[in-house]
Regions:
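Glycine-centered hinge/linker elements that transmit conformational signals in sensory
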Residues: 238-274
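A structural signal for short loop-to-beta-strand junctions that line the ligand-binding cleft
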Residues: 97-98, 105-106, 137-172, 201, ...
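Extracytoplasmic/periplasmic substrate-recognition and gating elements
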Residues: 295-371
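Extracytoplasmic/periplasmic solute-binding protein
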Residues: 155-158, 189-245, 250
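Hinge/lid segment of periplasmic solute-binding proteins
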Residues: 39-48, 113-165, 216
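Short helix-initiation/N-cap motifs at beta->coil->alpha
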Residues: 87-95, 113, 185-190, 270-289
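C-terminal capping/gating helix-and-loop segments adjacent to ligand/active sites or protein-protein/ligand interfaces
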Residues: 366-377, 389-444
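Conserved N-terminal structural module of periplasmic/extracytoplasmic solute-binding proteins
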Residues: 2-12, 16, 22-117, 327, ...
Length: 444
């Protein structure tokens, strides 16, 4: 006999069901966007993600992290989506732990193309969406996009960047002494000789950096190799298509030695050639301010190392000029930066990655200060800091041939190991041959 449910119980069940449904639908405010508002017109392509949350994990912390959160606030307000950001000083280690443990963030900002490739090869990363590809291609040069492209597929989009091809100097000292900013390598060496003849050491440097001691010297090699041999040889070198002790690399290293291992040139205000190895990166350029050294080759981010109250400007206490090319018709530039990559392909994750590749985010972040981007549509009027503005001008120059920091492209055992150690030993007395042979032998 078929069982029957009393009609009154059925009715009661229906009422309860309706009540539960109403509670589920009406118990909270339905998430909505504000894309219909005039101030949100730039975000109309990011619809359908209201109420969604996207997690981002990176190495950017403290004040810089706060500025990042401010930079995408308008995106959140207009789209109704939320970005949950976490910055850590242990990023390189912890991103591997999280990914391997199945706790990958939706998006990570990765500064090492080699690490991006590792995650691509492991199948962990998602390819960039069509929207991200279109946006990134419109806003960044192929020189940048290639560092996040593997087997013809784009996985990451550039975010922030820095320029390493700078020489810091004192505008006041140069003016008082009648020294002109050199525009070619030959002029740079001629100026160095002129300064040395006055009894002042023209150059100062420091490569001590704890467990990372040596990295500033690797930047010297990379920057000069781009000038000495050109971008094609540079590309062959970082991928080990030519050995580390190839004659072309020997040539560039010897050229660096004409400055860094020249007792008449270094180490102004600090000591002899060997003192470079024991002088911290942070202190390596400080004698420029006191006039005991004339020039210091270091990246745009060295602006943060000058003593409090130092005016960084073309008419200030310190400023920087472009590290001259050997061939004045060329403009090689060494730099680095972060790429946004995704470990999930939900629509909201794809939307955030596309937004971060846009001119809207680049300009939003630039207005907040202390930011450089290679985004071609970054408006220079939004970049207030003089050295940041000069960096953006260089990155946007159509003559610029950009190459990413070589040590970040090499296997970590080389780029963050034997290369650092080898260059430190080179500064303290080892020959170029011994040094390059040692580094080459470590490349497995």
């Amino acid at each position: 006999m078929a069982s029957r449910t009393p009609r009154r119980l059925l009715a009661l069940t229906g009422v309860i069901g309706l009540a539960l449904t109403a509670a589920a639908c009406g118990g909270g405010t339905t998430a909505k966007d504000n894309l219909d508002k005039p101030e949100c017109v730039a975000f109309k392509d990011y619809s359908g993600i209201a109420g969604k949350t996207v997690s981002i994990y990176a190495s950017i912390r403290d004040t810089e992290a706060d500025l990042l959160r401010q930079s995408w606030k308008e995106f959140e307000n207009c789209t109704g989506a939320k970005i949950s950001y976490e910055g850590t000083g242990e990023f390189e280690t912890q991103i591997n732990v999280r990914v391997d443990g199945g706790r990958a963030p939706d998006i990570a900002f990765i500064p090492q193309p080699g690490l991006i490739e590792k995650f691509v090869n492991s199948g962990k990363l998602k390819a960039a969406s069509d929207k991200t590809k279109t946006t990134a291609t419109a806003n960044y040069s192929p020189d940048w996009l290639k560092y996040a492209t593997f087997n013809g597929t784009l996985y990451g989009a550039p975010l922030g960047s820095n320029v390493k091809s700078f020489v810091w100097y004192s505008p006041k000292t140069f003016k008082d002494k009648g020294w002109k900013i050199p525009e070619t390598w030959d002029e740079l060496i001629a100026l160095s000789n002129t300064i040395a003849a006055t009894g002042t050491k023209p150059w100062c440097a420091g490569i001590e950096s704890g467990v990372a001691t040596g990295w500033p010297a690797t930047d010297w090699i990379e920057d000069v190799l781009l000038r000495d041999q050109g971008p094609d040889v540079y590309d062959q070198w970082v991928t080990h298509k030519i050995p580390f002790n190839d004659p072309k690399i020997v040539s560039a290293t010897e050229r660096v030695g004409t400055i860094l291992k020249n007792a008449n040139y270094v180490n102004g205000g600090i000591g002899d050639v060997k003192s470079i190895a024991t002088t911290s990166f942070q202190e390596g350029g400080l004698p420029v301010v006191s006039g005991k050294c004339a020039m210091h080759r270091q990246a745009s981010f060295y602006a943060n190392q000058w003593p409090q109250g130092t005016k960084v400007a073309e008419d200030g206490d310190v400023f920087a000029f472009y590290f001259p090319a050997i061939d004045p018709s060329k403009k090689p530039v060494l730099g680095a930066g972060e790429f946004t990559v995704t470990f999930a392909d939900r629509p909201e994750v794809q939307a955030v990655q596309a937004y971060l590749a846009s001119e809207h985010h680049a300009n939003s972040r630039a207005k907040l200060g202390n930011w450089v981007s290679a985004n071609k549509k970054l408006d220079l009027t939004n970049v207030a800091n003089p050295i940041d503005k000069k960096s953006v001008e260089i990155l946007q120059d159509t003559k610029t041939v950009f190459r990413f920091d070589g040590s970040d492209l090499m296997p970590s055992g080389v780029g963050a190991g034997s290369f650092w150690k080898g260059m430190t030993d080179w500064i303290t007395g080892k020959s170029t041959k011994e040094t390059l042979d040692f580094i080459e032998s470590s490349w497995k």
